[in-house]
Design a protein with these regions (language model features):
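Short, charge/polar-rich alpha-helical segments
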Residues: 1-9
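Acidic, low-complexity, intrinsically disordered interaction modules
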Residues: 10-65
Length: 70
């Protein structure tokens, strides 16, 4: 995994919990971010097939890992 991919994964992970402002000026980082983000959303849709709303998927995901971050 390249350094830029690691950065993108960290941003995706942190963004779910901290709602970070993403700096899109780095096109390569932006491309990796969205690639990982859409892969992640597909994973959530598979994990919670009964939930189709993106906000509800993210909420379920955050609640699963809230205790892990505390």
């Amino acid at each position: 995994m390249t350094n830029i991919e690691k950065q993108a994964r960290k941003i995706v992970r942190d963004a779910y919990f901290d709602y970070l402002e993403i700096d899109y000026s780095n096109r390569e980082l932006k491309d990796h971010f969205f690639k990982i983000y859409y892969h992640h959303m597909q994973f959530l849709e598979d994990l919670f097939p009964e939930t189709t709303d993106e906000d509800k998927l993210e909420s379920k995901w955050r609640s699963m890992f809230k205790k892990e971050r505390e």
